[in-house]
Structures are given as C-alpha cells and as structure tokens.
C-alpha cells in the first residue's frame, strides 16, 4: 500500500498525539502559588497561517492580559510541548483555552481563529 505524503503526515501526527496521550509525563508543572493568575493557553503550529493570524491577535490584546491572565504557548514544533496536546485532547489548531494556575481546564474556545472580542469573552469578567 502506497501512502501519499499528505496521508503519511496525518498518520505521523496521529501517532505522535497518541503517544503523547499515553505518556505518563504531563509536562512542566506550575509552581503552587496562592492567588496565581489563570492561564490563557494557545496551542499552535508556528508554520500554519491560521495560527500565525491568531498569534497576531493575541499580541494585539496582550496589554489587556496583564494582571488578568498569563499567556502560555504550546507549539507543535517543540518536542517538550507535545504531551500537552494529548493532555488537553487537542485535535484542531489554533486552539485557545483557559486553565487555572494548576492547569485544570476552565473554558475552551471552538478551534479556529478567535477575534479580540472572543478572546476577551473567553477570559471572562
């Protein structure tokens, strides 16, 4: 059976995500802090145009995040970040979600590009 390059790439991504989901490592653990800020977590492929567009939007609203949330990036190109994709069940990019300081998921946006207003609403009041 001969696979096209596109099919092979999809297969490799699926295998990597499955391996990450089966891994006992959960990635870096946040330090225990009282009163720590929630995290706005951005799962991205730095080479993908939709993810690049979402990154620009996040940079636009970054000044509004100060004191409200910590912005955390997980990239498909960083091997150390891959387990986080499995941990949160990420299957589509770009994806934004909000976690508490310990990493527990609070809210998740629909995968795709979120406008500045959608990012603000995701963070809540």
State what each model feature region is:
Residues 52-64:
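Typically the conserved alpha-helix immediately C-terminal to a functionally engaged Cys/Sec
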Residues 98-125:
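Non-catalytic, surface beta->alpha helical segment in thiol-disulfide oxidoreductase systems
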Residues 18-21:
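C-terminal motif of bacterial Sec signal peptides marking the signal peptidase cleavage site
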Residues 43, 67-81:
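Thiol-based oxidoreductase modules, predominantly thioredoxin-like and allied folds used
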Residues 2-12:
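Bacterial N-terminal signal peptides that target proteins for export
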Residues 23-26:
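Bacterial signal peptide processing site
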Residues 88-98:
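Structural micro-motif
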Residues 34-47:
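Short active-site neighborhood of thiol/selenol oxidoreductases, capturing the structured segment around
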């Amino acid at each position: 059976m001969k696979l096209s390059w596109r099919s092979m790439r999809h297969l490799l991504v699926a295998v990597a995500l499955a391996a990450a989901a089966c891994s006992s490592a959960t990635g870096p653990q946040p330090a225990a802090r009282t009163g720590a800020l929630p995290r706005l977590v951005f799962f991205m492929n730095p080479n993908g145009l939709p993810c690049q567009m979402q990154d620009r939007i996040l940079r636009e609203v970054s000044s509004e995040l100060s004191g409200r949330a910590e912005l955390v990036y997980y990239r498909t190109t960083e091997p150390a970040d891959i387990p986080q994709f499995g941990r949160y069940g990420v299957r589509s990019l770009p994806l934004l979600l909000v976690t508490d300081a310990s990493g527990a998921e609070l809210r998740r946006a629909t995968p795709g590009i979120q406008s500045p207003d959608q990012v603000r609403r995701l963070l809540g009041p």
